[in-house]
Amino acid sequence: MSDVQFLINVMYPAANAAYSIMSVPTPPLALPPGFALVGPISADPLRAAPAMAIAAPSQQHIANAMVAESSIFGLVAWNAVDKTAIVAIRGTKTIWEWIADVDAVPVPYLPDLGAGLVHMGFQVVYEHIRSSIQGLLKTGCAGALRILVTGHSLGGAVAVLCGYDIAKNFGLGVAPELYTFAGPRAGAPDFTASFSKLIPKCTRVVNFMDVVPQVPLPPAYEHVGIELLVHGGFRPLDVTYAHHLTTYLNGLQKLPASVGVPPLSPPSIPVPSQIPTSQP
């Protein structure tokens, strides 16, 4: 399986399932091959209350928009053969529910105050689900050799905050790998530097003409990892089309399938290492 196939066959289905699981009743989840559901990532407003209390109303709105759609923010899945866990975090149904509030003053990252500054609204969202993710990983993914973290849109930014926390504080003994789709910038340059020291593998898939990865604006905010640019399509009269997760899949499918054939570790799930990239 090449790097592009890994994104299409493993990470895209995981990111898509993070949306599917919020439906009632939940349809059969199309998880990546070999993975079984550990459980849904559930929001806990009580645990997020301290962060909500100090957040500006506009930043509280970002979390409230997520909760209003569903208390389920994604899922954790487990491949028992390869000892690989997936954490997948959803965004909102439309970007208009939060993007107007994306311009926020960065604040200290609560799970590690020395790590730097992050987006206030994205942090409030993460505080809603931090304990749920930690519990699912510890109870359902014991002995993990590999942890893959993904998310689309707002979920991509929250995945960045989650990935750092897993590496720094969860005590699982493995640095997660991040593969996000259409994620906005999550932190300031100091957080990006701290993130890079802990997370050696982070690929951000970005579709040409998608506005969401362009916000919040630099220099106050800076992207983490390496950007993989795809051309999934856009429509001049529909700004959101370029942001759809299915549009991203279309862009990935246009890339050469033979790009980057890395060694397997663990067996049967490749380690992407040679994805063609452009710097953010």
Where would I find each of the regions flagged by the language model?
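Non-catalytic, mobile gating and regulatory segments of ester bond hydrolases
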Residues: 1-150, 154-280
